[in-house]
């Protein structure tokens, strides 16, 4: 500190002011670079926000996912029915935030890695739980409170191979004879899914959440 003071004392007032201004400019430029690009090896601010949203879930939403039971969240009359897989699970907190406290509740029923579709049969070990979930909705949807909106959400692109024709074996099927991602398979799926939504919509408004993008690797 004393060495710096001795050096500065030899400068004229003009040169000292110029030096101080240069230091301020350098720090200002560096601050702008950090603000725009962040520190090396640190997640960009946009990615950090996405990560925070990923964890923004209702603390009890996992209690009902995969348990095969329906859960009522909130207080008051039922305002919405949420059905789907773990992607639907992530919507629960947002739905509840848009209902004034104490003035409504959300019925949630979900099953991870399951596309809810009437009469579908999952083509993998453990798929019975998915079949049972679809069957439950088919048999019980008319008994749910009339007029309450139904929201369907899920990782549709994963279940349907991004709608691309392929010789790969399907995750679920409707016909034993059609078990690859063929044009016939997609036509059958389209017809069955639309028929299901129309049947559900005969009792209440039905909302289909756009498919959630899935990253192929962690970031």
Task: Describe the residue ranges of each PLM region.
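Extracellular/periplasmic envelope-modification machinery, especially enzymes
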Residues: 2-219
């Amino acid at each position: 500190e004393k060495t710096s003071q001795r050096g500065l004392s030899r400068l004229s007032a003009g040169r000292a002011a110029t030096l101080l201004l240069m230091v301020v400019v350098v720090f200002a430029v560096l601050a702008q670079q950090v603000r725009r690009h962040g520190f090396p090896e640190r997640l960009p601010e946009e990615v950090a926000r996405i990560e925070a949203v990923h964890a923004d879930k209702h603390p009890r939403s996992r209690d009902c996912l995969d348990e095969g039971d329906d859960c009522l969240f909130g207080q008051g009359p039922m305002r919405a029915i949420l059905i789907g897989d773990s992607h639907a699970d992530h919507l629960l907190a947002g739905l509840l935030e848009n209902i004034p406290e104490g003035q409504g509740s959300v019925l949630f029923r979900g099953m991870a890695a399951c596309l809810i579709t009437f009469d579908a049969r999952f083509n993998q070990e453990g798929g019975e739980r998915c079949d049972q979930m679809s069957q439950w909705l088919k048999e019980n949807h008319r008994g749910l409170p009339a007029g309450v909106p139904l929201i369907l959400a899920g990782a549709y692109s994963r279940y349907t191979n991004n709608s691309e024709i392929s010789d790969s074996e399907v995750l679920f099927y409707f016909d034993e004879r059609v078990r690859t991602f063929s044009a016939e398979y997609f036509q059958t799926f389209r017809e069955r899914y639309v028929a299901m939504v129309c049947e559900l919509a005969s009792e209440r408004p039905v909302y289909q959440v756009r498919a959630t993008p899935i990253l192929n690797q962690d970031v």
